[in-house]
């Protein structure tokens, strides 16, 4: 059992303090307690607050998926909202045998799918040829599962968890799954935090995967909605080109993945990763560590420590050559984009790239405007849905135009500016402005219990919550020499992916 407190002298009321000061401290009075079963508890006490932002984080996400089942982690999040024997069940004694029969029938279906693997395998580039789309036995088993699911639906009550939370003043009931994490969260009156603990302890151990195929179709609808955005297919094509092996770059399921989801695989993910020694409870608000230790022990203390989950093995090969994408689309605005792989959180260089991102946003826009190339410049570290990872990801420099006339000139200008930054220092004024912008963003986030909770939890799953404060401090210590060094080291041709969007029929 360990117990830590990190404190600084600076309170959040100092948001307006002199940003030009050389030393900046960050108020992170985080207390940590680790229970015997490995469950971690983090608390920021805010005396006087009558509410608390509560989240439970699990170190599991899209990284842990296998090919052909991408999106399975996100799907598991949906299933874990479907209740337990005590939440959402109208008659559990009648429902349980039906659930058992569904699982047994699915097991038989998996065996039949495996037996018929050569018959039903997709053999066409354009998904247009299988010897057989199904077998009579697969059809029969699926119909039996559908019949059983309808019986189960008659025995369940939708939205039980939501009703509990709303009945006791809960707001912001959300959940999210990304590459490295899943979290469930709620904002509650501080004196109602037991509701959260009771529900989440139950969810961690007793989740029932109800309405499996109905939820599968919700993911299909979400995927269709995503693909209807003009830039979605382009972004996925770029991410697939930047990353060769890492699941960081994979989407939340291709359309071909959804049909492959099974209760058996979802149960494997659930049993493997949703365990006390792979989870962290975080509270920011009007609670104390002493009271939360007692409450968490009451609801989670009896849960058994399990074997450590399988770690993620994927690792990108060393950068070995420039890659290019020509993406043709008549609706998406023409653009040129440069992407470079950068290190993940926990690497000593990573905080400096936050500063570089801010510097480059202003510098590239000014440079293109001064050369009368113009365009709308966007500098980002967003990969799929997330800006930060504990693994290598990428930084992007994009310029968007109304037509293709200036794309080549824009690419040349951005490459020239990057080359210049590898040879000459930026101005001290540019550096200070970027650092001030980052501090302002941090203080705004830290003043919101929910956003602060997210940042602490995100760093915990990427590396450690203890990395957060040094990370922020390192950004303030970034020098012009650091910027030049990293541009020279990382922004090289062998580590570069270039994408261009042009209309169909344009170019070669």
PLM regions: where:
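N-terminal signal peptide c-region/cleavage motif recognized by signal peptidases
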Residues: 16-18
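Cleaved targeting-peptide boundary
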Residues: 21-29
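A conserved hydrophobic secondary-structure block that centers on an alpha-helix together
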Residues: 261-268
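M16 family metallopeptidases and their MPP-like homologs
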Residues: 44, 49-65, 71-73, 89-202, ...
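Catalytic Zn2+-binding segment of zinc metalloproteases
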Residues: 78-88
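Sec-dependent signal peptide recognition
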Residues: 2-11
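An aromatic/glycine/proline-enriched structural segment found at the starts
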Residues: 23, 203, 207-211, 220, ...
């Amino acid at each position: 059992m360990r117990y830590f407190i990190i404190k600084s002298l600076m309170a959040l009321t100092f948001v307006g303090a002199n940003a030009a000061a050389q030393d900046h401290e960050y108020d992170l009075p985080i207390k940590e307690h680790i229970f015997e079963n490995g469950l971690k508890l983090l608390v920021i006490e805010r005396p006087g607050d009558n509410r608390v932002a509560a989240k439970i984080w699990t170190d599991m996400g899209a990284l842990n998926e296998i090919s052909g089942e991408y999106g399975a982690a996100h799907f598991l999040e949906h299933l874990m909202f479907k209740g337990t024997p005590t939440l959402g069940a109208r008659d559990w004694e009648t429902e349980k045998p039906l659930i058992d029969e569904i699982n047994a029938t699915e097991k038989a279906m998996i065996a039949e799918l495996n037996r018929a693997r050569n018959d039903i395998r997709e053999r066409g580039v354009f998904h247009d040829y299988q010897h057989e789309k199904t077998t009579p036995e697969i059809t029969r088993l699926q119909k039996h599962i559908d019949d059983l699911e309808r019986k189960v639906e008659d025995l369940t009550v939708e939205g039980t968890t939501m009703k509990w939370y709303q009945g006791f003043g809960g707001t912001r009931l959300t959940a999210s799954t990304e590459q490295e994490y899943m979290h469930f969260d709620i904002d509650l009156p501080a004196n109602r935090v037991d509701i959260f603990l009771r529900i989440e302890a139950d969810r961690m151990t007793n989740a029932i995967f109800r309405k499996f195929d109905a939820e599968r179709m919700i993911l299909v609808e979400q995927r269709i909605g995503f693909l209807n955005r003009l830039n979605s297919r382009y972004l996925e094509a770029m991410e697939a080109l930047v990353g060769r092996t890492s699941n960081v770059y994979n989407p939340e399921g291709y359309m071909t993945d959804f049909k492959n989801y099974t209760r058996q695989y979802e149960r494997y993910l659930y049993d493997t990763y949703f365990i006390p020694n792979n989870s962290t409870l975080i509270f920011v608000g009007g609670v104390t560590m002493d009271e939360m230790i007692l409450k968490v022990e009451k609801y989670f203390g009896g849960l058994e420590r399990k074997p450590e989950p399988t770690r993620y093995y994927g690792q990108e090969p060393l950068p070995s050559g420039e890659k290019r994408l020509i993406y043709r689309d008549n609706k998406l605005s023409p653009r040129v984009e440069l992407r470079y792989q950068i290190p993940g959180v926990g690497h000593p260089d990573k905080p400096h790239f936050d500063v570089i991102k801010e510097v480059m946003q202003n510098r590239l826009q000014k440079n293109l405007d001064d050369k009368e190339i113009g365009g709308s410049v966007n500098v980002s570290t967003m990969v799929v849905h997330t800006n930060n990872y504990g693994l290598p990801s990428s930084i992007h420099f994009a310029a968007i135009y109304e037509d293709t006339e200036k794309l080549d000139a824009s690419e040349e200008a951005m490459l020239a500016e990057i080359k210049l930054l590898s040879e000459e220092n930026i101005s001290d004024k540019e550096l200070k402005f970027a650092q001030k912008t980052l501090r302002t963003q941090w203080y705004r986030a830290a003043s919101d219990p929910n956003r602060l909770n997210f940042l602490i939890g995100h760093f915990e799953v990427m590396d450690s919550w203890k990395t957060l404060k040094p990370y922020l401090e390192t950004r303030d210590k970034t020098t012009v020499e650091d910027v030049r060094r990293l541009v020279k080291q990382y922004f090289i041709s062998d580590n570069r992916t270039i994408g261009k969007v042009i209309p169909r029929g344009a170019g070669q």
